[in-house]
């Protein structure tokens, strides 16, 4: 996540905290608002989103130990950990939860249908079945998207390689956000007379072989 996305996360946090501050419920000792952060795994982009959230709150006067109580939890990419964290946040009656990455948001949303949940590092909330509309989320879930501008990426490839006819796309087959972006790329590339050749991977160890396979297919 780049700095612009981190700022977007921070601004969203400030907006939601303003609403939470006005509701006057579920307060902790000394009227501290209880905020939970559930992060899928340690990763530079996810860590940046986390930092942007905390920094954004601090810039508007919301500081841990003063008027808010932050509860930072990392699931270490373990679904059972996500479930446990989500259930604990519900039991603790958090005033707001930041869910970092799609699985974290899905788990948190399944655990509570009324607790305010803000997501980040999520590509498409509708595809992830978190909301019914990205434009008007409704419900208790909202947040920021990290959707890649695939159309601009295809246009850049065309600008660099004017005669391009085939583009290779390596992505994680089990990740719905990756699937969504590849489908968008295929649809847009088709309008330019370009074929997208897919190569799926299960983990980072598969990437080199996937790239080799694409090269062998004259991509």
Predicted regions and their residues:
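Extracytoplasmic "Venus flytrap"
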Residues: 35-60, 71-80, 174-178
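Pocket-lining segment of extracytoplasmic ligand-binding domains
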Residues: 170, 176-219
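Beta-alpha junction/loop-to-helix N-cap segments that form part of ligand/metal-binding clefts
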Residues: 76-132
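Periplasmic-binding protein-like
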Residues: 36-38, 89-101, 118-120, 167-170, ...
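Short, low-complexity disordered leader/linker segments with a strong preference
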Residues: 1-34, 59, 63
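An alpha-beta-alpha
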Residues: 35, 53, 142-192
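Immediate post-signal peptide segment of exported/extracytoplasmic ligand-binding proteins
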Residues: 24-36, 60-67, 137, 158-166
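Structural motif
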Residues: 69-91, 200-215
């Amino acid at each position: 996540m780049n700095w612009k996305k981190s700022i977007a996360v921070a601004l969203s946090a400030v907006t939601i905290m303003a609403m939470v501050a006005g509701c006057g419920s579920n307060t902790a000792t000394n009227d501290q608002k209880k905020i939970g952060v559930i992060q899928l795994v340690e990763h530079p982009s996810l860590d940046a989103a986390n930092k942007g959230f905390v920094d954004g709150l601090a810039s508007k006067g919301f500081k841990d130990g003063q008027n808010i109580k932050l509860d930072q939890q990392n699931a270490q990419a373990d679904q059972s950990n996500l479930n446990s964290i989500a259930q604990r946040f519900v039991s603790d009656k958090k005033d707001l939860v930041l869910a970092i990455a799609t699985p974290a948001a899905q788990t948190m949303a399944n655990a509570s249908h009324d607790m305010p949940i803000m997501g980040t590092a999520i590509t498409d909330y509708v595809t992830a079945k978190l909301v019914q509309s990205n434009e008007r989320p409704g419900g208790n879930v909202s947040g920021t998207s990290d959707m890649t501008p695939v159309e601009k990426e295809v246009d850049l490839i065309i600008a660099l390689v004017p005669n391009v006819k085939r583009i290779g796309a390596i992505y994680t087959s089990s990740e719905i956000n990756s699937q969504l972006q590849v489908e968008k790329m295929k649809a847009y590339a088709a309008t330019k007379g370009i074929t997208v050749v897919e190569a799926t991977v299960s983990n980072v160890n598969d990437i080199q072989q996937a790239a080799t396979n694409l090269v062998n297919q004259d991509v």
